[in-house]
Amino acid sequence: MEINFRHEINGQKVITAIAQDWKTGQILMVANMNKDALQKTIETGKAHYWSTSRNSQWLKGESSGHTQEVKEILVDCDMDAVVLKVKQNGAACHEGYFSCFFRKLNTKNIENFNEEDLETILEKVFNPDDVY
């Protein structure tokens, strides 16, 4: 049995990785992992991902210090996505929020919505200008 790295982005075979707070169940972020990133995550207990924009592996929190300690890894029925149950140290979102899902979409028309249709539902944990 094998993990199914069937999604290809920029020539890299990846799986979808969802980071979830291990205590509350809050979804923190969605990213991609290639085989090496998943292996490194398993070996170190720290979340590693594959950056599709930089085409490189990265350790979550490498520059910000906001790391993810992996407590458990769940695999979906198709073996092409994982949920990382993590202890989030600091914030998961590079924009300064605990979760990347800090906005609520309040519209019935996804083809024509604007900034007023997005409601910020979380407070910032840090100022990105101070970290990046």
From Swiss-Prot:
Main location as per UniProt: cytoplasm
Binding-site list for Zn(2+): 77, 93, 100
Single GO molecular function: magnesium ion binding
UniProt pathway: Amino-acid biosynthesis; L-histidine biosynthesis; L-histidine from 5-phospho-alpha-D-ribose 1-diphosphate: step 3/9
Gene3D superfamilies for this protein: Phosphoribosyl-AMP cyclohydrolase
EC number(s) on file: 3.5.4.19
GO annotation, cellular component aspect: cytoplasm
List of residues binding Mg(2+): 76, 78, 80
Gene Ontology BP annotations: L-histidine biosynthetic process
Cofactor descriptive note: Binds 1 Mg(2+) ion per subunit. Binds 1 zinc ion per subunit.
Catalytic activity: 1-(5-phospho-beta-D-ribosyl)-5'-AMP + H2O = 1-(5-phospho-beta-D-ribosyl)-5-[(5-phospho-beta-D-ribosylamino)methylideneamino]imidazole-4-carboxamide
Cofactor requirements of the protein: Mg(2+); Zn(2+)
Keywords in alphabetical order: Amino-acid biosynthesis, Cytoplasm, Histidine biosynthesis, Hydrolase, Magnesium, Metal-binding, Zinc
Family from the record: Belongs to the PRA-CH family.
Protein purpose: Catalyzes the hydrolysis of the adenine ring of phosphoribosyl-AMP.
Oligomer and partners: Homodimer.
Name this protein carries in UniProt: Phosphoribosyl-AMP cyclohydrolase
The organism's taxonomic lineage, starting at the top: Archaea, Methanobacteriati, Methanobacteriota, Methanomada group, Methanobacteria
